[in-house]
C-alpha cells in the first residue's frame, strides 16, 4: 500500500528537442479531458491545435519544461520570458491524467515563480468552461481576471478556443 502522505517534491526539467513531439501529444491528451467532459467529444481535432502549440514553442523567450514529482514526469509547462520588460506569460501548464489533485500544479507554479523572481507581471489564459483552472489560477496562484473572451467577446487576433 502506498503512503499518500509522502510529500511531492516538484521540480522543472528542460524539455529536449527530441522530446517535443511526445510533450505536445501529452499536453493535447491532458487538455482534451476537460473538452470531452464539457462537450462530449473533440470533433475539431486536437486541443490545443498543433499550430497553437508550435507557435508557443517557437515564441520569443519560450522555455519548455517537464514537471517532475519526486523525479517522475507528471506534466509540463511552457512559459515565455521577456528579459527586457519582465512581463512574462504562462502559455501552457498541464498535469497528466490521473496525476492531479496532489498539489503538484500549485507547487509547479511556485517553482516557476522562484525560477523567474524578476517577473513584474505574469499573464495566462484558460477557457471559460475550465472552472477548475479558473479556481486554480485565481484562488490558489493569485492571478486576477482582467479580460473575458468568448464567442460573443473574442480576441480578433486569435482563433477561437473550444468553449471560448
Task: Describe the predicted segments one by one.
Residues 93-100, 126-128:
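A short, internal acetyl-CoA/4′-phosphopantetheine-binding micro-motif in the GNAT/acyltransferase core
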Residues 48-66, 75:
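A short helix-loop-beta-strand connector motif used in the catalytic cores of GNAT acetyltransferases and
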Residues 64-66, 72-81, 89, 94:
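Conserved beta-strand in the GNAT
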Residues 31-53:
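Conserved GNAT-fold acetyl-CoA-binding loop/helix
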Residues 114-128:
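Conserved GNAT acetyl-CoA-binding A-motif
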Residues 95, 101-114, 139:
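Conserved acetyl-CoA-binding loop-helix of GNAT-fold acetyltransferases
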Residues 125-127, 139-163:
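Conserved catalytic-core motifs of GNAT/GCN5-like acyltransferases
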Residues 10-25:
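A short beta-loop-alpha structural element at the N-terminal edge
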Amino acid at each position: 500500500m502506498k503512503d499518500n502522505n509522502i510529500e511531492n517534491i516538484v521540480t522543472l526539467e528542460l524539455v529536449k528537442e527530441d522530446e517535443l513531439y511526445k510533450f505536445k501529444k501529452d499536453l493535447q491528451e491532458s487538455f482534451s479531458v476537460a473538452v470531452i467532459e464539457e462537450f462530449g467529444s473533440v470533433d475539431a481535432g486536437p486541443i490545443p491545435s498543433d499550430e497553437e502549440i508550435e507557435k508557443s514553442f517557437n515564441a520569443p523567450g519560450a522555455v519548455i519544461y517537464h514537471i517532475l514529482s519526486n523525479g517522475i514526469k507528471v506534466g509540463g509547462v511552457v512559459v515565455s520570458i521577456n528579459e527586457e520588460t519582465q512581463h512574462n506569460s504562462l502559455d501552457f501548464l498541464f498535469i497528466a491524467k490521473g496525476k492531479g489533485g496532489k498539489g503538484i500544479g500549485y507547487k509547479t507554479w511556485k517553482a516557476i515563480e522562484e525560477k523567474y523572481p524578476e517577473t513584474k507581471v505574469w499573464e495566462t489564459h484558460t477557457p471559460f468552461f475550465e472552472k477548475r483552472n479558473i479556481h486554480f489560477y485565481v484562488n490558489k496562484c493569485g492571478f486576477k481576471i482582467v479580460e473575458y473572451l468568448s464567442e460573443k467577446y473574442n480576441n480578433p487576433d486569435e482563433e477561437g478556443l473550444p468553449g471560448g
